[in-house]
Amino acid sequence: MTNPKHVVQRYLDALVAGDLETIRDSFAADAVWTMYGELPIAGPWRGREAIVDDFLVAAGGTLYEPGSVEFEFPTLIGEGDTVVLEWRVRARTAAGGDYANAYCGLFRVRDGRIAEVREYLDTQYAARTLFGAAAPA
């Protein structure tokens, strides 16, 4: 049995390196990534191709200046098939502003691949900073 923490760490290493092939291989064909909230990129994103091509690559490529994204992964905890990850993103936005947000995700691993991700972040900050949306009154 593959250690779920190792599966998620492999994905994170590929993410930092920009290794699209390994990123794609990290997900089960029927994986689901849910980003909660009302952002234009909120999901669920269903299936490996939708997660990688339509969400991770497309959104990242349009929201941030190329080459400006920096990741930090201070916490990675696993038990059974579940891994909890805390991560931070710093970047220059496509509009030229600074972005720094903290995230938490619950990853479920099945048969050596990521089968589910539930992602949480400060969506009001992301809406203002990435999409120019005013916070609700």
Feature roles, as predicted:
Residues 1-29, 132-137:
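Short, low-complexity N-terminal intrinsically disordered segments enriched in polar/charged residues
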Residues 6-16, 42-45, 61-64, 86:
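Short, mixed-charge, low-aromatic patches
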Residues 17, 36, 42, 46, ...:
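Short glycine-rich loop/turn motifs that provide flexible caps or phosphate-binding loops at active sites
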Residues 8-11, 23-24, 31, 47, ...:
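Hydrophobic pocket/interface hotspot
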Residues 3, 56-137:
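A beta-strand edge to alpha-helix "cap/lid" segment located at domain peripheries
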Residues 22, 28-78:
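A solvent-exposed, acidic/Ser-Thr-rich amphipathic alpha-helical stretch
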Residues 1-2, 17, 23-26, 44-45, ...:
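Alpha-helical interaction segments
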